[in-house]
Amino acid sequence: MTDDAGVTDAAAHYAPEIDGEPDPGEVVWAWVPYEDDPSQGKDRPVLVLAPDERSAGDGWVGLMLTSQDHDRDAEDEARHGRHWMDVGTGGWDSQGRPSEVRLDRLVRLERAGVRREGAVLDERVFHEVLAARRGLDG
């Protein structure tokens, strides 16, 4: 499910801990459904923002990452309600490619859908992502 219910600014706090469990500030690999056909999707890196307040402690919410560059088509993406932010490189991409995070589509992660931890996002960048998400609302 991909909606904004279930996460608040208070719940989103930087707390990575490489322990096999997703934590805010970590990038994990998880199954993400396609928007146009939620019955299909693919494994992709997801930045964990917070525990999912709806899941009774057994899920998380996050934002998907991509190595595709949306800077060149940012106006078109924004017209379609898609907003991206550069987050740099990290251990989540084995080829070391720069990544972008999609700010406007919150992804719900269930424990069974998380495949593995990928890396930890820099704390400064994590807080910049949160600020950019808040900026979409106003």
Where do the language-model regions lie?
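Conserved functional hotspots at enzyme active or ligand-binding sites that engage polyanionic ligands
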Residues: 1-45, 49-138
